[in-house]
Amino acid sequence: HARTTAEYYGGHSDWSRIGELVSELDIPVFGNGDIWGANDALAMVTETGCAGVAIGRGCQGRPWLFADIKNAFAGSDERVDPTLGDVCRVIERHAELLTEFYDGDERMAVHDLRKHVAWYLKGFPVGGSTRRAFMECENLEDVRREIGRLDPNIRFPERIADKPRGRVRFAKKVHLPYGWLESRETTHEEREALFGDDPMDASY
């Protein structure tokens, strides 16, 4: 990942660091950072020589990014051009899968969905009132009602396609145990302090 914790989401990730790793290691290196579109993936591989790319925020609300990247690596210019209706079908399916994940608890599922809705609707001319309405949904019926109020024929805005989205805040102060950056190993006590009792717990 070509951005430090201190850099947070500010600026563009430093792909040259990925290239340095590629030149130093004899194992495949996958690069990550600022992959917002298929052309970004091609550029990273070309510039760094990495074996592949890992996708982070770029796929938030844009699950078709993986298909675009697959096509790009295959030498195809084909890209997904979704309508708002296409995106709404993804939103509905996402809500259904979350309901399954939460053992049928629609309220929990729809509350979880809220944080994704802004990503899905980013750039579409739907207005703040629509986003607020989704934030007030309590079950699948509510979600489907709000979807039904949208124009399914609106095209995905070209002006924001493959453009950075989400937080772009700059540097922040990092709090780490004394000597952390000078050591590649951690003690049991340090792992407990950072991750809790179970060092394999990824909930943090």
Question: Where are the regions a protein language model picked out?
Answer:
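Glycine-rich, proline-tolerant flexible connector loops at the mouths of alpha/beta enzymes
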Residues: 1-9
